[in-house]
Curated annotation (Swiss-Prot):
One of its GO terms (molecular function) is ATP binding. The lineage of its organism: Bacteria, Pseudomonadati, Thermodesulfobacteriota, Desulfuromonadia, Geobacterales. ATP binds at residues 15-23. Its main location: cytoplasm. Its EC number is 2.7.4.25. One of its GO terms (biological process) is nucleobase-containing small molecule interconversion. Keywords: ATP-binding, Cytoplasm, Kinase, Nucleotide-binding, Transferase. The gene is cmk. NCBIfam families: cmk (TIGR00017). The keyword Nucleotide-binding applies. This is Cytidylate kinase. GO terms for cellular component: cytosol. It comes from Citrifermentans bemidjiense (strain ATCC BAA-1014 / DSM 16622 / JCM 12645 / Bem) (Geobacter bemidjiensis). The keyword Metal-binding does not apply.
Length: 233
């Protein structure tokens, strides 16, 4: 087994909406001392910027120009990580249901995927990073040393999302939230460019009946095992 990269390994966590990727990535990054790159937040930042600029989701030329002038960064703020779009903190603004659905459409556009692909590869090239999204292990970093595919039933993912929305004071019914999760799955799995699918060498984890701590321990032990193999290589 070859040695790991300059700063460690690249960990790719893929899976559908609501599978718990963001929460687990943050916790795993903290335990390993790695940098968390939230690729979903990057696409959401593009969607928010496009909405503000009045750029339609099928306007490839407009989206390409938007991405050229958009700088996305992550800033650690204590236990949380803020998402910045051209210096503005958009961490909360990008998490609405409206932006979530728009993101699924815009993220399927080739100019957007290409622009963010380049950003993500630059951010993670030296290792010591955890990236989560829908095509990290298949497209962004197919050579990532550790890959996970995190899933859960649509009902469980909808329930988790419903609780998140309720905690933020957003009005939605459980049935509506589950329906939107299923709709998002169809969009993500059916898009032309980089559809959601499990990498052949990814470790599959169904978190439907597992606690966050159980999933976290499984992920941490897998990464540490890979690091140990690299040290011997």
């Amino acid at each position: 087994m070859s040695a790991v990269r300059e700063n460690g390994v690249i960990v790719a966590i893929d899976g559908p909406s609501g599978a718990g990727k963001s929460s687990l990535t943050k916790l795993l990054a903290k335990r390993l001392g790695y940098i968390h790159i939230d690729t979903g937040a990057m696409f959401r930042a593009v969607a928010l910027s496009a909405q503000r600029a009045g750029i339609k989701s099928d306007d490839d030329a407009g989206l390409a120009e938007l991405c050229r002038g958009l700088e996305i960064a992550f800033a650690r703020d204590g236990e949380t990580c803020r998402v910045l779009a051209n210096g503005e903190d958009v961490s909360t603004k990008i998490r609405t249901e409206e932006i979530g659905l728009l993101t699924s459409t815009i993220s399927a556009r080739k100019p957007v995927r290409q622009a963010l692909l380049e950003m993500q590869r630059k951010m993670g090239a030296k290792g010591g990073v955890i990236l989560e999204g829908r095509d990290i292990g298949t497209v962004v970093f197919p050579d990532a040393e550790v890959k996970f595919f995190l899933s859960a039933s649509a009902e469980e993912r909808g329930r988790r999302r419903y609780l998140e929305l309720a905690a933020r004071g957003e009005s939605a019914t459980l049935e509506e939230t589950i329906a939107k999760v299923i709709q998002r799955d169809r969009q993500d799995e059916g898009r032309e460019h980089a559809p959601l699918k499990q990498a052949q060498d990814a470790v599959p984890i169904d978190s439907t009946s597992l606690t966050i701590e159980q999933v976290l321990e499984l992920m941490e032990s897998t990464v540490k095992e890979r690091l140990a193999q690299g040290d011997k290589g």
